[in-house]
């Protein structure tokens, strides 16, 4: 078998939707977690520097920010593992379909995973059962754990609902920073508004970031414009936008996983057709 033919057969058996969704998931989670972590740090610095001089005013906010940062660490680890498992599930379903319908030209891992459902080749002969390849044995063990694609569909569905909440929450800081940036634009170009520059403010207390008794709690006029021109504000704003984009990419990947797994499972269990994802 030539190299090109071997590569072509490998590509034919690859679950392309799962591969794309896995790459999108890793990219989105990395963007969301990395940029979100740094954006929270930047927010903490902005609050400490410009919006409150009393540590007790933002002590609770700092605790919340640190808690979210720890959650980000766990989220990155979880999605790295779960994305890999969903990719394995894609190979699993593909291998099972091809095994059931007589196409044995799958990868070693695909055969090992599919063997847990189909029973696989037993290798009977004079020497008894053949000795399995080490990688195939590992995949068979993994396949026993992945042998319930319907449960993976359910877990992914629940995870998608949960991530919808995370996606919505990631839009909140973007909204706050965008409003602040819009106010700064009105200050920089006073002809666009009829309000007095001194009355144009960004109030952190209004969004619940600081308690109402925090002082000063808000920044107005030219002082606010100078904050918007700092690299800290601009970087934090763009980091939150990047985190929002990462959350959106992760949501798309989860939807792709769920649709592909649902369709694949239906084909495998109900329709009996060798379609793969």
Curated annotation (Swiss-Prot):
It comes from Gallus gallus. GO terms for biological process: axon development; central nervous system myelination. It comes from the Eukaryota. It is a multi-pass membrane protein. PANTHER family: MYELIN PROTEOLIPID, MYELIN PROTEOLIPID PROTEIN. GO terms for cellular component: myelin sheath; plasma membrane. The gene is PLP1. InterPro entries: Myelin_PLP (IPR001614), Myelin_PLP_CS (IPR018237). Residues 2-10, 89-151, 269-277 are cytoplasmic. This is Myelin proteolipid protein. One of its GO terms (molecular function) is structural constituent of myelin sheath.
